[in-house]
Amino acid sequence: MVIPSNTTVYVDADSCPVKEEVISLARTFGKKMVFVYSYAHTMSLPKDVETAIVDTSKEAADLYLLQSVNRGDVCVTQDHALASLLLVKGVIVLSPRGHVYKEEEMPAMLAWRHTSQKARRAGKKTRGPKKFTASDRAAFYHALYAVLEKIAKE
């Protein structure tokens, strides 16, 4: 895929644990950053970080991201459904744990998500995500570095 040189790094920022890593690497590679979050999750960010503050409705940040991204942009999100929609638009999507999402894995990920939601609605307990660790943070840093380095070389 040919990536435009004006790539923007978007962050689904409400519960993103790797904001500092995104800021550091986007600065290193000279990329514009846009952090999208609801006004219920106010945060203090450096002046060079563009922010989009959205309503608290369930999908407001997702809708903003879907309307704003362009082919070749990068997005950090934990939301598998959002990731699947962004991939179709040609966006490079990473999880905060450093997983670079691929279109071919999304059907299985979404099916698992659906099964878990169904079980929770039926009153069953399901496992939540594992605790975020230092190795998750390092994996994210290396994955985002590799993505931005590849873009810089194209």
From Swiss-Prot:
Disulfide bonds: none
Pfam families on file: DUF188 (PF02639)
Family as reported in the entry's similarity comment: Belongs to the UPF0178 family.
Descriptive protein name: UPF0178 protein ABC1688
